Amino acid sequence: HALGYNTITKQTVRTSSMLFQNEWKNEHWGILLGGRFDKHNLINHLIFSPRANLRFNATQNIHLRLTYAGGFRAPQTFDEDLHTSMAGGERIKTYLAKNLKEERSNSLSLSADMYYNFGNVQTNILIETFYTHLNNVFAQRVLNDHDENGIRILERFNANQATVWGMNIEGKAVYSKWISMQSGLTIQRSQYKEAVEWDEDAPAEKKFLRTPNIY
């Protein structure tokens, strides 16, 4: 209930899941296969999300990993949708489009995890590249319409497809059991396959809005 705006969002979310996986491994190799079944009360069918992982220990201090995973986001109202924001001096609130479908993802990543000791200092560097393909990706657009409270409507709808790809680097140094330092850097690109018009007064964009390329 948004006090002061006379708006109420009522939503009941239930998810039942079953996870299974099996792993085969030896000193140098590891293979993991598995998946998850989800039944979300806002989706009328069962969703299967597979996963697979291939690990290779090149040496005792260098570990390589190739991972695939599927996933989804349900067509539901999220926490950030409960806030009434401002756009062009006008109140605006997020609503879900009719027949909104779940967003599906397929992700692939390749990483190298490396360890080295400099005297008493233990160090670890992780370098990872990733690629994610999204189907029925969620996007938002401002409609030239208002709800019963006079608040302009920001609609979440299914755009066609999108991709997110990039690289992640993380480093850690442990000086003692009391002192350690850790830092990371992610460089990525997020782009719709087809340009999305989020406002009739703004040009259509392929890039994700409010999504940093470096962080």
What residue ranges belong to the model's regions?
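Outer-membrane beta-barrel translocator domains and adjoining extracellular loop/strand segments
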Residues: 1-7, 43-50, 77-83, 90-91, ...
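Surface-exposed extracellular loop regions of Gram-negative outer-membrane beta-barrel proteins
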Residues: 9-41, 45-51, 171-173, 178-189
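Membrane-embedded beta-barrel scaffold of Gram-negative outer-membrane proteins
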Residues: 57, 65, 99-157, 163
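Hydrophobic, lipid-facing positions within transmembrane beta-strands of outer-membrane proteins
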Residues: 14-20, 35, 48-54, 64, ...
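Gram-negative outer-membrane beta-barrel transporters
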Residues: 25-30, 130-133, 151, 155-215
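Transmembrane beta-barrel strands of outer-membrane/channel proteins
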Residues: 1, 33-37, 66-70, 79, ...
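Short loop/turn motifs that connect adjacent beta-strands in outer-membrane beta-barrel proteins
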Residues: 27-28, 61, 117-123, 178
